[in-house]
Amino acid sequence: MTSNALRSALCLGVATGIVLIGPSASAQLRPEPGAIEVASGDLLDRLRTDPFAYFRFVNRSWTTRVCEVFADEMRDLPIARLHGDAHVEQFAVTKDAWGLDDFDDSARGPALVDIVRFLGSIDLAVRQGAWTPSRETLFDRFFEGYRKALAEPDAGSPQPGIVDHLRAQAPRSRAAFLEWGEMKMEPMTEASVGAVVAGMEAVARSVYAEQPDLPPGYFTIARAGWLRLGVGSAVSAKILIRIQGPSPAPEDDELVEAKEVQSLIGIPCLEAQSDQPTLRVILGARQLGRLKPTILAAGPELVIPEVLARGRPLRDWWIRSWDPSYRELGLSDLRSVQDLAEIAYDAGVQLGAHSVVDQAGSRDASVRTRELARLTRLERRIRDETLRLIEELLVGWKELRVP
């Protein structure tokens, strides 16, 4: 089935091999109010033509709906550290690591938030790849990995075959990487650049306290600009900054991204945010993440004219360094259903191994045992509700496609 034909089939709610479960009374999953209005024309075109992009864009609405669907179970479910937006295209590799990345929506809440999100992404991926007969088997592989990690959190998982394939895709020299990054920077006013410089000076003081081995001048800014990337994070303010790095020589400069944290207030089954919302992102990346950036830190309030024009200062933001070898998976990278099966198992292991770690870093065996029992009891319902939620999502996507 061609991509266009598949999208037409999805739009009608049917595709070869799919057993439909009708959407519930809410009928559709729409973006948050105002989100479409601030989306760029290019992004809007992508949302209208790609159901997976739409899935990524409506994560907040999706999570809220998951909380509603499983409201009767929430009281008995343990609170876990969540990825918050776990899906197939969050799988990424660097030269020495692989796994789910991008913890912008990390929070604390019931583990089934991550489970349902990842299963939903599998369902959309098999529809796009015409692999729907393998959907239940792929769900099985995810649950196998998740259960394995709950039982043996230090067991790990084998490297998926696609990792080496992704690493071999157009490797870039550092010079090419830096040039590419500068091409992504969009102009900022002098006042805004000055605010970024002051903010980075504050970040430097914080990072040096934790990493005193970094050389002086590491955070000296060479250039900065607005960054317009992402799907789920497209409405967040983002700044890309070139800094001096290990030495004054331009060849070893670093790129760091400063990103605004989006509020999760109002999502019913997530824990209330702290006074420092950036901490949920930092803790999620450190506890669940396998890819370890050189720089990962919270930032101070930035008073940037362009952001103030939108009605608020850039109060809650964080920075992360970019790795030249970083490569994210796209659905088009999947060579076979076996690739997807290996990623599903690996993601299950990653999420299951660390989701029930408490604030002190403990992985209490009794908590993991209870989580295994609940997972077994709820697994069939989780599968069925995931498919129903995807049907609701596709109804919302079809609505967006209609001018």
Regions found by a protein language model. Give the residues of each.
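Intrinsic-disorder/low-complexity coil detector
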Residues: G22, R30-E32, E186
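Sequence-structural signature of the catalytic-core scaffold of metal-dependent phosphohydrolases
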Residues: E152-Y208
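Conserved ATP-binding subdomain of kinase catalytic cores across diverse folds
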Residues: Q28-L43, T49-H83, V88-R167, L214-P403
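Short N-terminal edge-element motif at the start of the domain
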Residues: S206-P216
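Bacterial N-terminal signal peptides
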Residues: A9-I21
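Bacterial N-terminal signal peptides that target proteins for export
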Residues: M1-C11
